[in-house]
């Protein structure tokens, strides 16, 4: 599914603060529920996309509106030596959000059916089995109380080039530039084929993919914010009741 918004950039800018506040409120309710009540629910936001799609911007401008103590962010790069000793899902399991938290994956386990496929890191008979493995893995997460929001962030080839060019023109952006990004551009058709297979094989009723066009940053940020709000509202969250006598505590405080 692709989230829709019929307004303009100015409309989004006007709406954003209000929606940020709503998201922050819901996130705090989720966190409070796990601290004060027997509530093991959590939420996992998976951001998967090509370089410059804006994954970091979502973390900063969307998720950043929430209380950081209830957020668990993990960026998945090239596997470390230790990670390569284990199954590809090992590092994913270690980063899953605890109860009451929102987990943010900047890239994810889907690298293991995208990058490994495009670069022939493992043979097809290996990565080909991973689609079903991932589906079973995510089904278990959902059954255990984790709501999964998977976002495929798509940026056009021209827009990616413009964003990479900007990084080369601005000294404050040099740190974000990676020469390997140009090499990856040459593999664009192969990546599009891999992404298509990913969407077809791993979009399920319990963990569907949401395809978000990302050439306009204001749109992608608002669209993903709305996905988060919709998912949290679907949990029917409420503030946990006091586990103490409120009236008695008011009297104690007044006389203290």
Q: How would you label these PLM feature ranges?
A:
Residues 1-256:
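Glycine-rich phosphate-binding loop of ATP-dependent small-molecule kinases
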């Amino acid at each position: 599914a692709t989230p829709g918004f019929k307004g303009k950039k100015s409309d989004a800018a006007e709406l954003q603060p209000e929606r940020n506040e709503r998201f922050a409120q819901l996130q705090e309710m989720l966190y409070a529920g796990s601290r004060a009540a027997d509530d093991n629910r959590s939420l996992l936001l998976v951001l998967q996309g090509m370089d410059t799609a804006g994954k970091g911007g979502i973390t900063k401008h969307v998720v950043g509106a929430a209380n950081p103590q209830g957020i668990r962010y993990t960026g998945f790069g090239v596997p470390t030596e230790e990670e390569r000793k284990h199954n590809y899902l090992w590092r994913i399991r270690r980063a899953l959000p605890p109860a009451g938290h929102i987990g943010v994956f900047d890239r994810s386990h889907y690298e293991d059916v995208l990058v490994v496929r495009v670069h022939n890191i493992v043979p097809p008979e290996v990565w080909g089995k991973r689609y079903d493995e991932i589906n079973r893995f995510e089904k278990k997460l959902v059954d255990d109380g984790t709501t999964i929001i998977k976002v495929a962030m798509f940026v056009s080839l021209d827009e990616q080039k413009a964003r990479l060019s900007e990084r080369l023109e601005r000294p404050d952006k040099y740190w974000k530039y990676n020469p390997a990004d140009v090499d990856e551009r040459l593999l664009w058709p192969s990546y599009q084929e891999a992404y298509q297979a990913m969407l077809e094989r791993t979009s399920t009723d319990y963990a569907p993919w949401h395809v978000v066009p990302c050439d306009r940053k204001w749109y992608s940020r608002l669209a993903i914010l709305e996905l988060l709000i919709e998912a949290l509202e679907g949990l029917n969250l409420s503030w946990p009741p006091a586990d103490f006598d409120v009236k008695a505590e008011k009297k104690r405080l007044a006389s203290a």
